[in-house]
UniProtKB/Swiss-Prot annotation:
BP GO terms, sorted: cell wall macromolecule catabolic process; pectin catabolic process; xylan catabolic process
Segments annotated as Sequence repeats: 78-90, 91-103, 104-116, 117-129, 134-146, 151-163, 164-176, 181-193, 194-206, 211-223, 224-236, 237-249
GO molecular function, one term: feruloyl esterase activity
Natural source organism: Piromyces equi
Name of the protein in its database record: Feruloyl esterase B
Protein's UniProt keywords contain Manganese: no
Chain segments carrying region Disordered: 203-273
Activity regulation as described: Inhibited by the specific serine esterase inhibitor AEBSF.
Compartments in which it is found: Secreted
Lineage, uppermost ranks: Eukaryota, Fungi, Fungi incertae sedis, Chytridiomycota, Chytridiomycota incertae sedis
Glycosylation, residue list: N65
Residue ranges, annotated region (Catalytic): 257-536
Assembly mode: Component of the multienzyme cellulase-hemicellulase complex.
Biased composition (Gly residues): 203-252
Length: 536
């Protein structure tokens, strides 16, 4: 049975590989002409660069070894290298396409090492050897046995059937000692591993099966911190986001049919204090505000009879509402939690669509644009006007910082990433919040676009802006909010600092990602921060 499945999928695998094109073109964006182009932004789709003032996808170079050098079959092909069918008994085979049927340190075989050590890079796996596929990498079908078979396998669509740290498996790890630790991204689940991650059908057992699983629609049947499951966690702690209930875990939350051991589901509460009569918009739509597009997405099952919170998410420079709709982790966290999410197009400027966050990029009145959108959406959909939040990445992070300066009367809190207030805005007296404003900024120490320590930046030639720097931005917000004392380490180990003794009961935070670059921060953490606040 396994053989027939493997052979049937081989054809699909080879066909799809042969017909593959640039990944970004399938998303409507050009491919960078230079595969070594500078990485400006990274998301779930891949690495993004900029060419001709537009986003482009950076295509990874793929090795294409068409060598059919048969090597020395006699004496087993020791140190053979480059053989398409393999070394049937020798050591240090290297670069074989069909596998080493008994040698050590096989390396780079697409069909697998049937008994050798340190196989490496096999797409079908090691069917039996000692340490059969350690540090294998890039195996699509997995390791079907072996002691510690397939440790740190990585990127397997069907799974490691016994190894640790499988990584990216679509069907799961069906056993093994700590099978599939840090698996990640499996749609059917890790059947025994830790930190499964992103499984759609769940983890059905195992030692600490599926800890920090995340995003499973049917549930984690034994793991902790499952997260985002629609039908329930049947034994794990901190399940989260389940629609039908947690049948034994702690903090499961909010079931439609009752709490049988924990809480679950979208944790955001809808307000009954808002009159929703006549507000009929409750499904995904595009609005036109001042000639710009705004994409509005509604949570699954939204009925419009109770008022939901709204997250406004600003895109990076040269981005768009359409691009950022699929790129923001903060938006995904909010939508999964039951909030409405809006993605707005920035105004066209010298460097593409941008936001007016200082003496660069665009002269548009984005503050009034945001106000106009809020007025429109609250008249058409049942939005809680006291729980409207802002977030964004890069220049979108700058706009969500600036929202606190100019929109604190309509925006309840913000969670910006990878941008500071411009010194010109602060020194020019343009940041005067109407009230104490809660804000949590995310910044990477290795950001090469908006430097962590701040300084002069020429985003647009001839129109420089001066970033305050992460720490100074943090202190400036604390000062404007009347915070006293020293910031606390909010959660040990996550390198987040938080001022909690501030006017109006607000908080001011900074999460520093050591070694982090120019990227969006922890989306769930950002959303969890803002949603605790509402307008007075």
């Amino acid at each position: 049975m396994k053989t027939s499945i493997v052979l049937s999928i081989v054809a699909l695998f080879l066909t799809s590989k042969a017909s593959a094109d640039c990944w970004s073109e399938r998303l409507g964006w050009p491919c960078c002409s230079d595969s070594n182009a500078e990485v400006i932004y990274v998301d779930d789709d891949g690495d993004w660069g900029v060419e001709n003032n537009d986003w482009c996808g950076i295509q990874k170079e793929e090795e294409n070894n068409n060598s059919w050098d048969m090597g020395d079959w006699n004496q087993g092909g020791n140190q053979g290298g480059g053989m398409p069918w393999g070394d049937f008994g020798g050591n240090q085979g290297g670069g074989m396409q069909w596998g080493d049927f008994g040698g050590n340190q096989g390396g780079g075989m697409p069909w697998g090492d049937f008994g050798g050590n340190q196989g490496g890079g096999m797409p079908w796996g090691d069917f039996g050897g000692n340490q059969g596929g350690n540090q294998g990498g890039g195996m699509p079908w997995g390791d079907f046995g072996g002691n510690q078979g397939g440790n740190q396998g990585g990127g397997m669509p069907w799974g490691d059937f016994g190894g640790n740290q499988g990584g990216g498996m679509q069907w799961g790890d069906f056993g093994g000692n700590q099978g599939g630790n840090q698996g990640g991204g499996m749609p059917w689940g890790d059947f025994g591993g830790n930190q499964g991650g992103g499984m759609q059908w769940g983890d059905f057992g195992g030692n600490q099966g599926g800890n920090q699983g995340g995003g499973m629609p049917w549930g984690d049947f034994g793991g902790n911190q499952g997260g985002g499951m629609q039908w329930g966690d049947f034994g794990g702690n901190q399940g989260g986001g389940m629609q039908w209930g947690d049948f034994g875990g702690n903090q499961g939350g909010n079931q439609d049919w009752g709490n049988q051991g924990g809480n679950s589901g979208p944790t955001v509460e809808y307000s009954t204090d808002v009159d929703c009569s006549g507000k009929t918009l409750k499904s995904n739509t595009n609005l036109n505000i001042n000639g710009r597009k705004v994409i509005v997405k509604f949570p699954s099952g939204f009925t419009g009879d109770k008022a939901a919170p709204l997250l406004i998410n600003y895109h990076p420079i040269m981005g768009s509402a359409s691009q950022w709709e699929s790129g923001s982790q903060t938006a995904k966290a909010a939508l999964n939690d039951g909030a409405i999410v809006a993605f707005m197009d920035g105004a066209q400027g010298p460097m593409g669509q941008a936001w007016n966050v200082g003496p660069c990029c665009t002269d548009a009145d984005d503050v009034q644009f945001t106000r106009n959108f809020i007025k429109e959406i609250t008249s058409k959909a049942c939005v809680d006007p006291k729980r409207i939040y802002a977030a964004g990445f890069s220049m979108g992070g700058g706009m969500s910082n600036y929202a606190g300066c100019q929109l604190a009367d309509v925006i309840a809190a913000a969670a910006p990433s990878a941008f500071d207030l411009a010194k010109e805005i602060v020194d020019g007296g343009k940041c005067k919040p109407a009230r104490p404003f809660p804000i949590l900024n995310f910044r990477g120490t290795q950001d090469n676009v908006v430097m962590y320590n701040g300084g002069l930046s020429q985003v647009v030639q001839g129109k420089p802006i001066t970033f305050m720097g992460a720490k100074n931005n943090f202190k400036e917000w604390a000062k404007m909010n009347g915070c006293t004392g020293e910031p606390k380490q909010n959660t040990p180990g996550n390198n987040c600092e938080m001022y909690e003794n501030c006017k109006g009961g607000v908080k001011v935070g900074l999460c520093t990602i050591n070694g982090g670059g120019h990227a969006e921060g922890d989306g769930k953490m950002g959303w969890d921060f803002v949603k605790q606040f509402s307008l007075p």
